[in-house]
Amino acid sequence: MISLKSIVDKLYNLEDLSYQESYQLFDYFIKGQIELPSQTSILTALKLKKETSIEIAAAVEALFDNTKEFPKIKGDLAGIVGTGGDGFNTINISTTAAIVAATAGYKVAKHGGRSVSSKSGSFDLLESFGVNIELAPDQTKQCLELYNLGFLFVPFYSDGFRHIKEARTILKTRTIFNILGPLINPARPNKVVIGVYSKDLILPMAKTLVNLGIDRAVVVYGSGLDEVAIHDDTYVAEIQNNQIIEYKVSPVDFGIDTYAIKDLEGGLPEQNREIIKQILLGKGKEAHNAAVAVNVAMLMKLYDKDDLKQNTQEVLEIIKSGKCFNTLQQVINYSNK
């Protein structure tokens, strides 16, 4: 076993960790074997050094090895998730996109927790709607099979995350755990859209996904946002057949107008709840609908639907039908049986 001191010394010298060292470090983290002052300094050192794809992949495996198993789902399973930490406090676009994608017929497993760095995390929003976020894995699997949508609450699958919650709160900034969050979905989706909070993270995240054997994925950075942008360019790394292709898209590629970031500002869970409810009922503002639609359109690309404009129009029609709220209501009812 590699000692914590030797690992920490390397980090303080801003040296990259080996796969084994990173695995051991995050095994210590998740088992609560690192004191709070050391946690904050280690996370800060990793951030200053910049995390490598090897360190991230090793951390993912360590966390998976300490996570409750989720029953295997037949066929394709999608994930739409952001790292968080972009600092803009927009409405919960990835959560809404997951509900819309499920309504469009794609099975989506949404893994997340309550807010760490924003005013309203994805599961804060779900709770405000009345979703029981602590379903057992077999119940969540059945929900996925019935309604194409399942919510996996982080603390339910890995209670070790409680050991690092205080350090993340103290730091009040994004850390490697923002990067790890989208990668440790216990349902193990094979088609994922991951938004990152920094352009510098696109390639490390994409390389990590290749190392983890993900079938199809896109990593996106939306000019300040950890999702596909409607205000400016979105930088993309697409993964197919273990190859990474980098490109850039803009609102015009989706056939939509350009909007301002302020058009997407969110608030407290109750405020977000009302905004999201209106979107799902087909009564949302144009900017809100567009933001959700482009993110679902990008997911559809992973199912060999390459025409982003057509994808976006299809999604906008589904949103405007109001059927998406029915999907959420079915999940709410199922989760409270």
UniProtKB/Swiss-Prot annotation:
It catalyses: N-(5-phospho-beta-D-ribosyl)anthranilate + diphosphate = 5-phospho-alpha-D-ribose 1-diphosphate + anthranilate. 5-phospho-alpha-D-ribose 1-diphosphate binds at residues 82, 85-86, 90, 92-95, 110-118, 122. Keywords: Amino-acid biosynthesis, Aromatic amino acid biosynthesis, Glycosyltransferase, Magnesium, Metal-binding, Transferase, Tryptophan biosynthesis. Mg(2+) 2 binds at D226, E227. Mg(2+) 1 binds at S94, E227. GO terms for molecular function: anthranilate phosphoribosyltransferase activity; magnesium ion binding. Belongs to the anthranilate phosphoribosyltransferase family. Catalyzes the transfer of the phosphoribosyl group of 5-phosphorylribose-1-pyrophosphate (PRPP) to anthranilate to yield N-(5'-phosphoribosyl)-anthranilate (PRA). Homodimer. This is Anthranilate phosphoribosyltransferase.
